[in-house]
Regions:
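Active-site helix of classical SDR
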Residues: 2, 6
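NAD(P)-dependent short-chain dehydrogenase/reductase
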Residues: 8, 12-55, 61-62
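Alpha-helix C-terminal capping segments
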Residues: 10-17, 39-44, 70-71, 83, ...
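Glycine-rich Rossmann NAD(P)(H)-binding loop
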Residues: 49-54, 80-88, 127
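Amphipathic alpha-helical segment in the mid-to-C-terminal domain
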Residues: 60, 90, 131-135
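Amphipathic alpha-helical segments that line or abut small-molecule/effector binding pockets
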Residues: 61-69, 136, 140
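Mid/C-terminal beta-alpha module of Rossmann-like enzyme folds, strongest
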Residues: 66-69, 73-121
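C-terminal amphipathic/interface module of NAD(P)-dependent oxidoreductases
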Residues: 104-147
Length: 147
């Protein structure tokens, strides 16, 4: 698809001393509410939670930790690596965020959107030893690093 092709075209993956991390981030924004987290936290009443849309990114605070502890210490690491968490539906992700953040909102399950852009981090894990924590832990971490 166009999304995948555009990502591929922007990735440098065949040069020594160059690493490309393919990932997706979720987290707090400084001046906008364009991302999923800030959008969700700004909503009132009810929202739809996509039961068949799969997400496997990581909180931005965790991505920073990954780079600091699992990329920088490996100067010979090069090429393209996927860095991700355990795949989770957007419905389950929003439900966990609501629980951890104490957000009072109704999340209506919606199965009309079917999308799986999950990543497989096996190669990165084998190269670095990194394995993402479970989603409740990651969301607690994200909540603890509000700006």
């Amino acid at each position: 698809d166009l999304y995948g092709k555009s990502k591929y075209l922007g990735e440098v993956c065949d040069q020594p001393h160059v690493i490309t991390l393919r990932t997706s981030g979720i987290g707090h924004e400084l001046r906008s509410s364009n991302g999923l987290l800030e959008w969700f936290l700004s909503q009132q009443g009810k929202v739809r939670g996509y039961a068949k849309a799969i997400y496997s990114g990581l909180p931005s605070v965790e991505l920073g930790r990954v780079i600091n502890r699992f990329v920088l210490p490996f100067p010979k690491l090069h090429g393209l690596y996927h860095v991700s968490g355990t795949p989770i539906t957007k419905l389950d992700l929003l439900t966990l965020i609501a629980e951890v953040y104490g957000k009072q909102i109704v999340i209506e399950p919606d199965d009309t959107v079917v999308l799986d852009r999950s990543l497989n981090s096996k190669r990165f894990t084998e190269a670095t030893g990194y394995a993402a924590a479970e989603w409740p832990v990651l969301i607690e971490l994200m909540n603890g690093h509000r700006y």
